[in-house]
């Protein structure tokens, strides 16, 4: 399972490298969609079936629609590929080599180091019981996100509204 997670992590980082060095909008959108699928697979690997499915359905469904329209508007007759420019190909290969080197370096360690320390983890305790119970952590975590992060939901909604308003104004023209 650790090797699968390392493979998914390398795929995710390589997707980001491919997106940042996109030679054509078509390939950038494709790599971003593939990176989203790999991110959903990482969430599923950690046991988050509900959140992985929601991200896959909502995020990737909307992304495919948006990138379908944007690539139709910015279509090129001969799109530039990753191998057409030497600089782009070298940067992708250097990024791949650095990622493989990092994975091999981290694989040599026996244990993992805690990077983040959660000080107030007690306030996130949703259900604490003595006996066995049928309760999933994933939907409860989504409920806690909307409860403790309600300001983030409001800011995200407002940002989406402003983005849609800007797109409508641009599409309307003069």
Swiss-Prot record:
Chain's gene name: MT-ND6
Subunit structure, interactors included: Core subunit of respiratory chain NADH dehydrogenase (Complex I) which is composed of 45 different subunits.
A single Gene Ontology CC term: mitochondrion
Membrane topology summary: Multi-pass membrane protein
Keywords: Electron transport, Membrane, Mitochondrion, Mitochondrion inner membrane, NAD, Respiratory chain, Translocase, Transmembrane, Transmembrane helix, Transport, Ubiquinone
Native source organism of the sequence: Pan troglodytes (Chimpanzee)
Swiss-Prot/TrEMBL GO biological process terms: mitochondrial electron transport, NADH to ubiquinone; mitochondrial respiratory chain complex I assembly
Subcellular localization: Mitochondrion inner membrane
Pfam families membership: Oxidored_q3 (PF00499)
Assigned protein family: Belongs to the complex I subunit 6 family.
Membrane-crossing segments per the record: 1-21, 24-44, 47-67, 86-106, 111-131, 151-171
Enzyme class: translocase
Task of the protein: Core subunit of the mitochondrial membrane respiratory chain NADH dehydrogenase (Complex I) which catalyzes electron transfer from NADH through the respiratory chain, using ubiquinone as an electron acceptor. Essential for the catalytic activity and assembly of complex I.
Catalytic activity: a ubiquinone + NADH + 5 H(+)(in) = a ubiquinol + NAD(+) + 4 H(+)(out)
EC number: 7.1.1.2
GO molecular function ontology, one term from the record: NADH dehydrogenase (ubiquinone) activity
Protein name: NADH-ubiquinone oxidoreductase chain 6
Keyword set includes Membrane: yes
Disulfides per UniProt: none
């Amino acid at each position: 399972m650790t090797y699968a997670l390392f493979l998914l992590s390398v795929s995710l980082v390589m997707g980001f490298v491919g997106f940042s060095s996109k030679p054509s909008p078509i390939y950038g959108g494709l790599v971003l969609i593939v990176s989203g699928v790999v991110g959903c697979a990482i969430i599923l690997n950690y046991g988050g079936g509900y959140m992985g499915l929601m991200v896959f359905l909502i995020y990737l469904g909307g992304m495919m629609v948006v990138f379908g329209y944007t690539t139709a508007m910015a279509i090129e007759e001969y799109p530039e590929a990753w191998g057409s420019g030497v600089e782009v190909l070298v940067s992708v290969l250097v990024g791949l080599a650095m990622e493989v080197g990092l994975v091999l370096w981290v694989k040599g360690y026996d244990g993992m180091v805690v990077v983040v320390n959660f000080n107030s983890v007690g306030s996130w305790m949703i259900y604490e019981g003595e006996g066995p119970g049928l309760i999933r952590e994933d939907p409860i975590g989504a409920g806690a996100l909307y409860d403790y992060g309600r300001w983030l939901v409001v800011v995200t909604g407002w940002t989406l509204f402003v983005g849609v308003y800007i797109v409508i104004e641009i599409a309307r023209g003069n």
